[in-house]
Regions:
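Metalloprotease/metallohydrolase-associated module, dominated by Zn2+-dependent proteases
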Residues: 2-34, 42, 79-244, 252-254
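Small-residue-rich helix-interface/hinge motifs
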Residues: 39-96
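Active-site rim/adjacent substrate-binding subdomains
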Residues: 249
């Protein structure tokens, strides 16, 4: 086989992978927006609902660690609610606000990272492996025993298997699917953004905590977090779609 033929085959293969990944992006967005609104398919939406709750609660806990506090444990429940238990220094209003914001914007930051990794097959495998490893570690270290541990361990294990066994195009598609879930989680759970009281606990919501610590109306902080997540989603999509349609010399090198 001549070098020109090998280069042509690599180019065709790369284009096929890009098309698969773009199709996965489109169907991921459609599924995320449609499943909760179709009664017959509502059961299929539940695992995605739980995933958004995990992302939200881990965002709180990891932010607490980043600002010098502790992340004790977290729990998610079959109805989609969840709670993260963390500790901060006394009278740390600003830190409290940051921890509250972490649950709202943290998933969008993770999504942007995954969109960047999904531009290349190897990056997609690395992203899936990191995701799976993080969920397995969270299940072992900070997840509440029972439903939370089972869900995190199962999803994390599946992600590790996917990283090892999926073809290049499917690995990219899987990571893009997860990135879309993270990006849209703050919108599919609009109760996170524009309510003063968290349901069903009746405690102040994250945006109410931010308003108490930093001033201003709670809905303004919800709007700010929502716009930040939207910006990350748009930038991630532009970066991903632009890169997936280009061929580099590295892609064609034998």
């Amino acid at each position: 086989m001549s070098r020109a033929t090998r280069v042509a085959e690599r180019a065709i293969h790369r284009i096929q992978i890009s098309r698969q990944a773009r199709a996965a992006l489109l169907w991921s967005i459609v599924a995320t927006l449609a499943l909760p609104r179709i009664p017959v398919l509502h059961t299929l939406w539940l695992p995605l609902l739980w995933l958004s709750t995990v992302a939200h609660e881990l965002g709180h806990g990891l932010t607490a660690l980043l600002v010098g506090g502790s992340f004790n444990r977290f729990v998610i429940r079959p109805d989609g609610s969840g709670t993260a238990f963390s500790s901060l220094p006394a009278d740390a209003n600003v830190l409290d606000a940051l921890v509250s914001a972490g649950g709202l914007v943290g998933p969008a930051i993770v999504a942007a990272t995954w969109f960047i990794l999904a531009r290349r097959p190897l990056g997609a495998r690395v992203g899936l492996a990191l995701f799976g490893g993080a969920f397995v570690a969270a299940a072992a270290l900070v997840a509440d025993p029972g439903f939370t541990q089972i869900y995190l361990g199962s999803v994390g294990g599946l992600a590790l298997v996917a990283a090892a066994l999926l073809s290049a195009g499917w690995a990219q598609g899987a990571l893009v699917f997860l990135a879309v879930q993270m990006s849209l989680s703050v919108y599919t759970r609009s109760d996170y953004l524009f309510t003063e009281v968290a349901a069903p606990s009746g405690a102040p919501s994250d945006v109410a905590n931010m308003a108490h610590a930093l001033g201003g109306p709670y809905w303004a902080w919800g709007l700010a977090c929502g716009l930040f997540s939207a910006l990350v989603l748009v930038l991630g999509l532009r970066w991903y779609i632009g890169a997936s349609g280009k061929l580099s010399l590295r892609d064609l090198r034998s």
